[in-house]
Amino acid sequence: MQPHTQPPQPEASSSRAVHIPSDPAPPRPCLTNDAIVSRWQSSPGFQYFWAWIKRRCDRLKGKEIIRGPFDHSAHGIRSLMNMLDQMTSWVEDATPQPQSNQRFGNLAFRTYNKLLQERLPPLIDSWDIPSNLRSQLLPLFINSHAFGHPTRLDYGTGHELAFVLGLWCCVVPGWVGGDNGTEEEEDELILRVFTRYLELTTFLQKTYNLEPAGSHGVWGLDDYCFLPYLFGSAQLLGSNLTPSASLSLALSHHPSATSPPSAPITDLYTLSLHHLTLFKFGASFSEHSPLLYSLSQMPNWVKPHGGLKKMFLGEVVGKRVVVQGIWVGGWCWGEDVPNVEERGDKNEGKGTDAGTKAPWAR
């Protein structure tokens, strides 16, 4: 295990001139009330993270998602990709149970999650990462349920955010990119690793019939995810693929399409539209996803991307019902992480923001 290292301090040019502790406080479930959630957005750790997200968006313009062999990627990228590949294979050891009365959630997902808790720590230990990174990473992946919640049998934007916070933590000590690598490695965290994560979580959603966590129903953006739309719209800024063409391309990849797709999917926005169509059916796209449909009517990606940035801060990071399950430590907050008693899972994911029932639902 490598010794503690001083995380590289962000440069002023990237709007990340904040202090991140080299000996960070251990993560804890502290986002349990609206006041603390509001404070989190102004904390040094979150400001660093948000600047990193915006920097990635700036650099993703015109770039395609990366698939295929990763033998020549940096060590950190290879380690994360191998982890996601192994996690996919663990499904074979937790085959779905027959379902009768449950609309959502196969109980075998609890078996899968138990395997994750047992197998993920030694796997990460084998990477020889800095000990201060390990202490931040495992609670984000395991305690924050970055791959879905075993009790509620659901998955949503809070779980997705926990995983991306974990990716960013890999950058903080320079294990990926940072002072010890290149920004291309950090871009690859999104274009390759995050893409692979989305494939895994979509597979888990389908295999175990996971319920959307905190869904707003017809009036939400997407029942399961948010960040791929933000990153994907950044990829498509200035692209010849218009929002309308992106939707058409996604629909052409649906298994029920009567003709072959006109082109491969090369961006996260269109990929997520495609994933969405695998779960929603029985109504037109404009009916089951009106917000995404309205974005498809825009002439270019400038307004959609800007609006998604604001929506991320307001409807994802700013909503206690979304983030309260995330374990936040010294890198994700900075100094003086709030010390709030853990309240367990019974209220996690519950809140005053009730989902909206689709008009065709009975």
From Swiss-Prot:
Residues 340-351 have a biased composition (Basic and acidic residues). Gene3D superfamilies: 1.20.120.1150. Transmembrane segments: none annotated. It catalyses: [protein]-peptidylproline (omega=180) = [protein]-peptidylproline (omega=0). Keywords: Cytoplasm, Isomerase, Nucleus, Rotamase. CDD domains: PTPA. This is Serine/threonine-protein phosphatase 2A activator 1. It comes from Cryptococcus neoformans var. neoformans serotype D (strain JEC21 / ATCC MYA-565) (Filobasidiella neoformans).
